[in-house]
């Protein structure tokens, strides 16, 4: 049993006055369209691309129409960070939900860990899941179920990630999810592509690797 989510009074809640790059602005525009069309979308953007700022217009659009918005993330520290940032950038009350948070109170904007989505049913017009590749959300059927049922019947779902997952890739391949990709950071420069340069003969490097592997300890190569 659940209580139906009532609409909020629509207001212009966005206080942020920053400027997006052309690449960010294009994705921001597509997210606003997704809100209007009630679509599911994956934003696959590199770390440092400015994903948080790119979702602001979509959040603002949903709140302006009286909708309920939730940003969920697998990690409590990220939820706290998002709460601090969005409290400065939006004028509406915000609920922060995690294992140690105060009791929930009804607000047009909720920031939570993904486990807290289990508390909601048909509650949100816009659900944004940040760091969807991270534990414990990644490939967790129970949390995907929670995300699905926390949305209203006609809602917008946005996944944010710098590293896609097999589950999301399959949804994209099946045309159940639209992927938007941004491979540039906020400064607009393309990513640096590493080039292998060996300063010593490969046989020497191989011998050192073999010696390390025989030690029984993990090996991490950069």
Residue ranges with predicted function:
Residues 16-39:
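N-terminal pre-P-loop "Q-motif" helix
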Residues 54, 58:
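Hydrophobic positions on the alpha1 helix immediately C-terminal to the Walker A/P-loop
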Residues 61-64, 102-104, 119-122, 149-154, ...:
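Conserved catalytic network of the ASCE P-loop NTPase/AAA+ motor domain
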Residues 80, 85-120:
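Inter-Walker segment of RecA-like/P-loop motor cores
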